[in-house]
């Protein structure tokens, strides 16, 4: 009797540990994933940046637009307006900023006969 009680207690302990290590019906979705998409077009002037929600990590591949107010909005990357927003944001990112100015530098140029001239 003591032997079978020990075996049953050991099995119950093993099952309890397995449930803690491998939770049943538990799926962790990263916070940077989209579970659903909005259907309404976001005005272009409200969007400041975007992130890609990777389909290999997330249940759905999506584009997360970040608005001026800091809201994160999941959108379907297959939609034409989403693709256009991405292209325009990428183009803005690659342009020099409006505050940037051309910098003039002076340096000596060595010419024949040892003369130097500033340019």
UniProtKB/Swiss-Prot annotation:
Pfam families associated with the record: IL8 (PF00048)
Protein name in the entry: C-C motif chemokine 24
Family listed: Belongs to the intercrine beta (chemokine CC) family.
Source species: Mus musculus (Mouse)
Top-level taxonomy: Eukaryota, Metazoa, Chordata, Craniata, Vertebrata
Subcellular location: Secreted
InterPro entries named in the record: Chemokine_b/g/d, Chemokine_CC_CS, Chemokine_IL8-like_dom, Interleukin_8-like_sf
Glycosylated residues (UniProt): 54, 115
PANTHER family according to UniProt: C-C MOTIF CHEMOKINE 24, SMALL INDUCIBLE CYTOKINE A
Region (Disordered): 96-119
GO terms of biological process kind: chemotaxis; cytoskeleton organization; eosinophil chemotaxis; immune response; inflammatory response; positive regulation of actin filament polymerization; positive regulation of angiogenesis; positive regulation of endothelial cell proliferation
